[in-house]
Design a protein with these regions (language model features):
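PLP-dependent amino-acid enzyme catalytic core
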Residues: 1-310
Length: 310
């Protein structure tokens, strides 16, 4: 099962990108094709392998980490394959689908204050570890260098190969920062002219689960903003609108962070006359059908001639 992680397909965005200059192309890497359903399979497996090699993860230990969903799902899946118990701390308001998937893999969930978001989960996870340090192995996705290394060694080379080296711009949302840091470092090494641009919510209070508004958040230790060529802020409304367009015009059902990534990519694409833009779609949208992305928002959205209604 774990050998299936990586080598995800690259999709050219066509109908949604109509009207761009003919020499501008946008591609999205569909990370939902990983066995655990998201880009987080990559760093989760890299961190677990490192824990096993170092001896920090061994029989009798429980895997513990904070998550907004996808890393937790990845760790729960990996734990089930390897036979390790998994305990996760996540905000109480994450979607029911993510809770159910994690529990289906046999992992335990401890819920943190929903008003504190992912930062609250980080703090509560640290407290649990402090109370029982010998019980747990904590991958610590926000501070573990194995997180970006997974993308440096795998995701980055895949993207460069899939575009035949023609990529000119790379965009990714900021959650832990692992994807943008790891892919960005690899691409800059092979071609320093490639632009690496981060995507983040435009406000501290937002509905883009999995993404961090860095100015108001605990900054992950693996995130180094000075390595970026820029950042593009995206509103919740614009990201949601792009999700609807993708489902109706491209046949791709994705989550909020993917909508934000494509909105930012289109924003950039309209400003250039030639280039190959690649972004990441971290997962598919089946884990978000019970959230505000679809419930309620559908009443106010029209895509093409289709009016969404509950």
């Amino acid at each position: 099962m774990l050998d299936l992680i990586g080598d995800t397909p690259l999709l050219e965005i066509q109908r949604v990108s109509e009207g761009l200059h003919s020499k501008v192309k946008i591609y999205a890497k569909l990370e939902g094709f990983n066995p655990g359903g998201s880009v987080k399979d990559r760093p989760a497996w890299q961190m677990i392998q490192d824990g096993l090699k170092s001896g920090k993860l061994r029989r009798g230990k429980t895997i513990l980490d904070s998550t907004s969903g996808n890393t937790g799902i990845a760790l729960a899946m990996i734990g089930s394959v390897l036979g390790y118990p998994v305990e996760l701390v996540m905000p109480a308001n994450v979607s029911i689908e993510r809770k159910q998937i994690i529990q289906a893999y046999g992992a335990k969930i401890t819920y943190s204050d929903p008003l504190e978001g992912s930062d609250g989960a980080i703090r509560q996870c640290r407290k649990i570890l402090e109370e029982s340090p010998d019980k747990f192995f904590k991958p610590d996705q926000y501070f573990n260098p194995m997180n970006p290394l997974a993308h440096y060694e795998n995701t980055g080379p895949e993207i460069y190969r899939q575009t035949d080296g023609k990529i000119t711009h790379f965009l990714a949302g900021i959650g832990t920062g692992g994807t943008i840091m790891g892919v960005g470092r690899y691409l800059k090494e092979v071609d320093a002219k490639i632009q690496v641009i981060a995507v983040e919510p435009d406000d501290a209070l937002h509905g883009l689960e999995g993404l961090k508004h860095m100015a108001s958040s605990i900054v992950p230790g693996i995130y180094h903003e000075e390595e970026l060529d820029g950042k593009i802020p995206v509103s919740t409304e614009d990201a949601y609108s792009m999700v609807y367009r993708l489902s109706q015009e491209e046949g791709v059902l994705v989550g909020q962070s993917s909508g934000a990534a494509l909105f930012a990519a289109l924003n950039l694409a309209r400003k250039i006359r030639s280039g190959t833009i690649v972004t990441i779609f971290p997962d598919f949208g089946d884990k978000y059908l019970s959230t505000n992305l679809w419930v309620g928002w559908r009443d106010r959205m029209t895509v093409g001639n289709i009016k969404f209604s509950i």
